[in-house]
Regions:
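Short, flexible turn/loop "capping" segments at secondary-structure junctions
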Residues: 58-59, 133, 183-185
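A ubiquitous short alpha-helical element
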Residues: 71-75, 93-99, 120-125, 171-180
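Short, flexible helix-adjacent loops and helix caps
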Residues: 17-21, 89, 93-97, 117-121, ...
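Short linear motifs at protein or domain termini
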Residues: 1-95, 148, 220-225
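Solvent-exposed, amphipathic alpha-helical segments
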Residues: 11, 15, 83, 87, ...
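Conserved amphipathic alpha-helical segments that form helical-bundle/coiled-coil interaction surfaces
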Residues: 99-168, 187-190, 202-213
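A generic short alpha-helical patch detector that favors 3-5-residue windows
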Residues: 4, 76, 80, 100, ...
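C-terminal all-alpha effector/ligand-binding and dimerization domain
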Residues: 165-225
Length: 225
């Protein structure tokens, strides 16, 4: 998926998350493309992607509509992902981090450090973060010697906003979003540290907490302002 395609997916996801498109609303390629100022092709791809994420469902032969879901549904789905990813992290820590997995995780940790080190975000950073975040989570999930957890996460990812890469980053307030990604990067580094040290319980706890950033961050930021 190109950066332009990812941007369209992210913008649509944000509009749904903010309630600009309400459950039951029908979405057409032409209307959405005109609203976003893009061609129909990335919109068509975005519809398919968001259908897989559980945000849209088919309505008729060619149309899509926003799926019905509640905040309780979102919270439960994200919490389930945290439990499953925490289980994977604990298993990986207790098994011992293989050198090749250590190297892969270190690479993406350094990518995140470099992105955060400059002290601000630009719009192109959003796709970079999405890529490194997906790799970090994916490596942990697929390195435990069993596909059971990965399969369970894949099924859960079909629920609205459940997937690790469905986090909403507001490109209209990058200063605020920088703080969220700064915290997420700190979590990544702590998780990596616990994996290297073989601290299974700590890795599990950190991974479960990390999954909740998207839900709890607005509340935490409001308390600090």
């Amino acid at each position: 998926m190109s950066n332009n395609d990812k941007n369209v997916v992210g913008r649509l996801r944000k509009l749904i998350g903010e309630g600009r498109y309400s459950p039951g609303d029908r979405l057409g390629e032409v209307a959405v493309a005109e609203q976003l100022g893009v061609s129909r092709t990335p919109v068509r791809l975005a519809f398919r992607t968001l259908e897989q994420e559980g945000l849209l469902q088919q309505a008729g032969k060619r149309g899509f509509m926003v799926r019905e879901f509640t905040q309780a549904d979102v919270h439960c789905a994200v919490e389930v992902r945290g439990v499953l990813e925490g289980l994977a992290a604990r298993h990986l820590a207790e098994q011992g981090l293989p050198p090749d997995v250590d190297k892969e995780l270190s690479f993406w940790i350094q990518k995140g450090k470099k992105l955060i080190a400059k002290g601000y975000l630009v719009e192109s950073d959003i796709n970079q973060w999405s890529e490194l975040n997906a790799h970090f989570h994916g490596i942990i999930i697929h390195s435990i010697g069993s596909g059971v957890v990965a399969d369970a996460i894949a099924r859960n990812n079909h629920l609205p906003f459940a997937a690790a890469d469905s986090i909403i980053i507001d490109s209209d307030d990058l200063e605020r979003e920088f703080k969220k990604l700064q915290l997420a990067q700190f979590h990544h580094e702590l998780i990596f540290q616990s994996l290297k040290r073989g601290e299974g319980a700590r890795a599990e706890m950190l991974m479960r907490e990390h999954a909740l950033i998207g839900l709890r961050y607005p509340e935490l930021l409001a308390d600090s302002e």
